[in-house]
Amino acid sequence: MKAARFVLRSAGSLNGAGLVPREVEHFSRYSPSPLSMKQLLDFGSENACERTSFAFLRQELPVRLANILKEIDILPTQLVNTSSVQLVKSWYIQSLMDLVEFHEKSPDDQKALSDFVDTLIKVRNRHHNVVPTMAQGIIEYKDACTVDPVTNQNLQYFLDRFYMNRISTRMLMNQHILIFSDSQTGNPSHIGSIDPNCDVVAVVQDAFECSRMLCDQYYLSSPELKLTQVNGKFPDQPIHIVYVPSHLHHMLFELFKNAMRATVEHQENQPSLTPIEVIVVLGKEDLTIKISDRGGGVPLRIIDRLFSYTYSTAPTPVMDNSRNAPLAGFGYGLPISRLYAKYFQGDLNLYSLSGYGTDAIIYLKALSSESIEKLPVFNKSAFKHYQMSSEADDWCIPSREPKNLAKEVAM
């Protein structure tokens, strides 16, 4: 901590030459400290100590920001130099500097605690458009440069880590703001954004109705919901887990939206639409949600592309300077939904029967003690990943025009 104070005292403003990199360099030497859902609950329990949360976050948030800033710096130069990526980078550096100022403040100073909440709100608002702005930077880069397969793979690797980092920092900031802010705007039954008794089926039904409303507006019809729940831990009891309802709703809404669109378009000439079937199962270790549609499915070669940040079936949106930047069209729905699932050690997978339909499966941890943040860390392994060079494929690639062996034998 003394080293951090020395760096602070030696730093002036953001405009000082070479000062910002020293801040980033200092905090990037630390690894992020992942928290479990149980620890996040303890931070917000009745005996929650604002000073403890303050002391943790003023160190942890700069560490997480600095780690991902180091990864931004080793991206292709043409990408880093785009106006969009430069803007995102400036937001992260400014936020890091804002937070580091509190290293000189005492946790016993009530004004410092109050100012810290205000700063977290300011940082959260500043980062509001990070996702579409970074997406725009990728588009600018791809429009200007030819992107080889290895670079494309590295972009996927980076964006997974960048957006997971963003999910984690927003989670920590939201928890502190909701619990310790003077204006109590959260759900009284929640601890911050966490519901200790999350009714999974209720979230499923709400996400379905939200998706259905959009489907009705666009297609003037929508499929029904057929829901089954199986509680393998406590038979005949409702299914509840400790979770973040907004994260679960985000995943479900995206999957229902895709399932409804596929169903309506595939069955447009049918007298009625096949219902979307959902089964929710609580086991000893996992909570599993399977969403099945009869929307015609997708070919196997397309499945991996659906989780690519550079693939979308919607037209590419145009960015403007408003705060309401679009997300549809960037192709980010499924990959970011998968990140939400993976954030607390879960997963999201698609299994498709081309010509029939698709199963989407969400896996979540059933126990809060096992729901631990999955966080990227900038280290030698991460750096090495970006240094991979393009090598020849060690599997035969089928030719689009196979040789005519009969003709060759005749010759």
Curated annotation (Swiss-Prot):
Result for mutant: residue 395 to A: Loss of activity
Primary enzyme class: transferase
Reaction(s) catalysed by this chain's protein: L-seryl-[pyruvate dehydrogenase E1 alpha subunit] + ATP = O-phospho-L-seryl-[pyruvate dehydrogenase E1 alpha subunit] + ADP + H(+)
PROSITE patterns assigned to the protein according to its UniProt record, in alphabetical order: HIS_KIN
Record localization: Mitochondrion matrix
Gene Ontology biological-process entries: cellular response to fatty acid; cellular response to starvation; glucose homeostasis; insulin receptor signaling pathway; negative regulation of anoikis; reactive oxygen species metabolic process; regulation of acetyl-CoA biosynthetic process from pyruvate; regulation of bone resorption
Tissue: Ubiquitous; highest levels of expression in heart and skeletal muscle.
A single GO molecular function term of this UniProt record: protein kinase activity
Residue ranges annotated for the Histidine kinase domain, each copy included: 138-368
Binding site for ATP: 254-261, 293, 312-313, 329-334
Coiled-coil annotated residue ranges, if any: none
SMART domains the record matches: HATPase_c
Regulation: induction: Up-regulated by prolonged fasting, in glucose-deprived cells and in response to a high-fat diet. Down-regulated by insulin. Up-regulated by PPARD.
A single Gene Ontology CC term: mitochondrial matrix
A Pfam short name: HATPase_c
Result of altering residue 394 to A: Loss of activity
Its EC number(s): 2.7.11.2
Keywords: ATP-binding, Kinase, Mitochondrion, Nucleotide-binding, Transferase, Transit peptide
Record site feature (Interaction with the other subunit in the homodimer), residues: 157, 161, 395
Function: Kinase that plays a key role in regulation of glucose and fatty acid metabolism and homeostasis via phosphorylation of the pyruvate dehydrogenase subunits PDHA1 and PDHA2. This inhibits pyruvate dehydrogenase activity, and thereby regulates metabolite flux through the tricarboxylic acid cycle, down-regulates aerobic respiration and inhibits the formation of acetyl-coenzyme A from pyruvate. Inhibition of pyruvate dehydrogenase decreases glucose utilization and increases fat metabolism in response to prolonged fasting and starvation.
Family: Belongs to the PDK/BCKDK protein kinase family.
Subunit structure: Homodimer. Interacts with the pyruvate dehydrogenase complex subunit DLAT, and is part of the multimeric pyruvate dehydrogenase complex that contains multiple copies of pyruvate dehydrogenase (E1), dihydrolipoamide acetyltransferase (DLAT, E2) and lipoamide dehydrogenase (DLD, E3).
Protein name: [Pyruvate dehydrogenase (acetyl-transferring)] kinase isozyme 4, mitochondrial
Organism in which the protein naturally occurs: Homo sapiens
